[in-house]
Amino acid sequence: MNNMLQLIRKKLSPTTLNAAVFTSFNGRYSDSPKAISQKLHELAPEIPIIWLVSADQIKSVPTYAKAIDIDTQAGEEAWNKAKVRIDNVFCDASTNLNKTDLKSKILFGIKTYFKTKKGQKRYTTWHGTPLKMMGRDQIGNTNVGFSCPNTTLLLGNEFTKEVMERITYGTMPVQMIGCPRNDLLFNLTSNDIQVKKAELGLPAHKKVLLFAPTFRSDGDINNDNVYRSGINQLELMNVSKLLDAFSKRFSSEWVLVCRFHYHVDAKINWEDISVRYNGSIINGNSFPDMADYLVCADALMTDASSCMFDYMFTGRPCFLFFPDLDNYNKVERGMYFDINELPFSCSQSFDNLLESVGNFNESSYASKCNSFLNRIGNVDDGHASERVTEMIIHDLKK
């Protein structure tokens, strides 16, 4: 009853806040919403920008925007009353989206009615091209779908569109405008990279190997899942040998920057990691936005994270280190692509990873990346944020 009363109250409250209200990953200042927010301020500085962030992220929000704690009543009211809302995790999960019985249809209709508000527009960018299966496609979750009424999905390629339309059962309209967080990765200059390195506190005269594993979960954020989400891979590596291999193949001195999923970052002790690896690993979670680290990375190493697809736009080498590939693909999650169809070499052992680094071929890699982008129907061109900004300006000036 309380939930229904809350829905009614939200439905009846007027959409009086003539502003763009942003949130990312339910409380972070990052990702595509951040890119859109920056472009909106650049092109239309007169439009009020509000960010809903967790308390520890408030200082990350620039002074031209108003930061509100997402876990407060003020945050809830701003989200409810805003004329335009932008996020990257719509994620209203439902187990009934694929059911056709009358009761399920009625319940979904009621939910849609109360979450649809006249005069309010919501854009969701999602957060990457998927390799790992989601929603109804995921192993063991064939009845699960996602839906968020009154929301337009903004996507960067036809493949992701097909996946999202399937797992939302066609309940959300899609616009193919590109992935705003990727704009930063186009037309980078050496000066851009050095400026960003300085902002992140990365060594200016060393090359950066970014290790960014995905989060593995059986439905729980426990210590075992945290361990399996990058810590285990680190223990299988000899970091000194790894950096030597990159130095031999790509010249210069290299450093390893580890960027863990935020669920993992919240659980691990970076001081312990620094001691265990004699200070040879740099904390890549010190700043909230993954895109900044991708800008600085001279090479990327991951497993099933969508950052591999974003990173292709830099033209720099990417390697997959995936010791638990078979279990992840066949038992735990499932993947949309055969791993051998990707442009990246995939290694299940550390020795094989070293071989892949030594045998890397630039021209072959570039050709494979271009073919893959054509295959998935890529529309990213570095101007996605501008397109979304134009839509927001139009919505707020109606």
Region annotations inferred by a language model:
Residues 66-71, 281-286, 342-356:
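Short acidic-hydrophobic, aromatic-tinged amphipathic segments that line or gate anion-handling sites
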Residues 1, 6, 224, 350-398:
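C-terminal amphipathic helix plus adjacent low-complexity
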Residues 68-84, 262-306:
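Donor nucleotide-activated moiety binding/catalytic core segment of transferases
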Residues 19-187:
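Active-site and donor-binding regions of nucleotide-sugar-utilizing enzymes
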